[in-house]
Amino acid sequence: MIEISARRVVGSPIGLLSIAASEKGICSIDILSPRSKLKDFSESRNAQEHVDLASKQLNEYFSGKLRRFSVPLDLHGTSFQQKVWQQIAKIEYGQTLSYGKLAKAIRNPAASRAVGGAVGANPIPIIIPCHRVMGSTGKLTGYSGGNGIPTKKKLLALEGISFK
């Protein structure tokens, strides 16, 4: 279980973002809906520094000044999910990758559906840019953050990515 030691809610062009950190780094970003509920936590200075840096970098990303994040992360998931998330983090700003190509990139070409599950379980959207993963035809598929596909469209448009 991840121990959240700092959290901040910040505004963005896609809605409110809840940034949470442990002592090690950012452990989640939630794109909040009006019904979202936040859990209590005990604050730590180290974790607060991670949240401060993530907040600054997200602001720079949304203003078009930042293309690659450098904030420390504290990712928790299965080894398969970790592989998928690490590969997603390599997708360049303004580029996309299909689920099938992502499966090939992790050397598991038959795992497109499992890759989709790992993409949907990404705890740190935007910083781990799962919005850049598309269907094989370039069609927009699901997005678990915020309002779903409309949120994904906004993120892709921000990066100048065309979609169907």
Regions found by a protein language model. Name each.
Residues A21, M134-G135:
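Conserved hydrophobic "DFG−1" position in protein kinase catalytic cores
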